[in-house]
């Protein structure tokens, strides 16, 4: 994530994102290459980088998985998820050029001989493509095999850079542990094999343009930062809503739930970006130092505050877009009496000078009314209301993260006519309208940053552990008590009634989905 100004002319000529020069040539070794994440998300992201000349033409992608297939089969499988027809990037010549750089390697994740052979193959790729020994390992496997892969890479002497001018890095997908103890154990295993500077713990939400733009919006403009504190802000709401159910992830979701899957990672990462202080410099160390300070300033949950300030829910049967959908307990692979949370909401306090007394309301859930992720900054009312009765809405600044990325500011304005009637209006900025095209896929942004050695948007070990330290008391309290009467919200709704009570007890209300 390089910080530099681009002129309007440059943006209009090159599109909303471009690379002035390709990255270093490298080998990308993708573990779990036959899985859904690799095929549906990572391959399109890598192709996007190649299409926009962000990858060196000589890059090599080596897929590693247990599934047996040939190089051609692997290329065919990857090609099924690349742009087609009128989609942006649907260029047959460029797709063919991209796919020819893909190769496949069959092996078990705990097979030492397979990793020795992998090391030999990488030496061959270095010579074949002039890659200079640069290697990016990507763990797109189930989390239970992370330590197996890392141990085998270490034993095969693949975790250290080959020389002063080469680099070796590893991207690790979430979930990074399932509680504080397991996160610490995994960090210890990773750091036995790699230096922290080599490790890129990925959270794809942080690759979205609006999320990155929070930093520019706050610290690159002189308008809003003076208001970004307890003197002017009444509350903050962060919503990550999905209309989808668990799809094919029931086995994983039964062991996770909304609190582990979304709140601990995506939502707390957004919160730290909203609440952080200005970094001394815009580099990975400075930004991540400020984020960890926020996480460490969050008020710990006690058993009492969990029951008061945290809500969990599970969806029942309902309708999405006018079509009936089953409840969570009726989904294939889910236990008939499952107590897994598909919705979580909480009130959070950041105990520092900037945010003292400002509640942060966080929520995330599946099978909600609309797929929508946003950060809403709700400002305090004017100290003296000269105009009464017409404009009942507070001023708000909303950063829309998905599905449509953009920023909107709402305020009161007089309606035309002789009477002093006031209604809320909005000023909107949308990426596609301003820049004329969709923003870069989040995974493409993050992979590109990793190849270029920029860790700004990736988690550090201490921030992962701090997030788990906050969430652990909630999970432990839930584990020691019976779940609420599930299901407690129908699919297609805004969530359980108890979530409305969470804000209602403070005289506030959630923004509608």
Residue locations for each model-derived region?
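Secretory/organelle targeting and membrane-embedding segments
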Residues: 1-172, 176-513
